[in-house]
Amino acid sequence: MSVPTVLEKILVRKAEEIAARRAIVSLAELEQQVASVDAPRGFANALITQARLKLPAVIAEVKKASPSKGVIRENFLPGEIARSYQAGGATCLSVLTDVDFFQGSDAYLQEARAACNLPVIRKDFMIDPYQVVEARALGADCILLIVSALEDGQMAELADVAKRVGLDVLVEVHDGDELERALKTLDTPLVGVNNRNLHTFEVSLETTLELLPRIPRDRLVITESGILNRADVELMEINDVYSFLVGEAFMRAEHPGAELLRLFFPERKLAASGPSID
């Protein structure tokens, strides 16, 4: 397993972060917290239901910064962004919680989820069962497993813990080898194809199109990164891909929900959502 240099740094730091968190809140304490959180909102089911109708099933990302781009959005108010996304027709939310590399926060996930009715994925680098239980304790409905960051045994263990605490799993792949490992190891219906090459950071929608024939029809393909305009959306829909994870294109827009609407639902008007940045 070849781990890109940036990812390697992130994983080293992540292990240190988990050790520090565990010293403050034990796994047993997290398990107790899980018992009192709201029931999961059904992340996978929401996406599958929408995509079966051949309508865009959009996972809209709440993302302040990234290692490659720095700060993406200065005016970063997770609750308002979440309401804006819901008004714009998002099916689910993705919230970055990694602190050191993405300027994320657990609080951002909680704020975003409390501000809307949408299911939420905790977008982080999951390497330890502790983080999975922690995700559910925070109120997340789904976790991300990045194949390039994990051995097969780790993936299976994390997915088992997720199932036990009621979380859906979105597995992310970047190439054919990772796809093969994911399909062999996990039975999650959600397969995300990241169009960004983690070694070069180049983005190509061809990544999704090339892997598509190798993904069983009973899995939902989610194309991630590189969806910037209507032509990109239409290219995917022509190829029967109706689920999208989009972050930067929305975060750079003055009104994220309005940009979502323009990109995916140009025939609709923005739904009323109460006070929001739209």
From Swiss-Prot:
Its EC number is 4.1.1.48. The gene is trpC. InterPro entries: Aldolase_TIM (IPR013785), Indole-3-glycerol_P_synth (IPR045186), Indole-3-glycerol_P_synth_dom (IPR013798), Indole-3-GlycerolPSynthase_CS (IPR001468), RibuloseP-bd_barrel (IPR011060). Keywords: Amino-acid biosynthesis, Aromatic amino acid biosynthesis, Decarboxylase, Lyase, Tryptophan biosynthesis. GO terms for molecular function: indole-3-glycerol-phosphate synthase activity; phosphoribosylanthranilate isomerase activity. Signal peptide: none annotated. Belongs to the TrpC family. This is Indole-3-glycerol phosphate synthase. It catalyses: 1-(2-carboxyphenylamino)-1-deoxy-D-ribulose 5-phosphate + H(+) = (1S,2R)-1-C-(indol-3-yl)glycerol 3-phosphate + CO2 + H2O. Gene3D superfamilies: Aldolase class I. GO terms for biological process: L-tryptophan biosynthetic process. NCBIfam families: PRK00278.1-2, PRK00278.1-6, PRK00278.2-4. Pathway: Amino-acid biosynthesis; L-tryptophan biosynthesis; L-tryptophan from chorismate: step 4/5. It is an enzyme of class 4 (lyase).
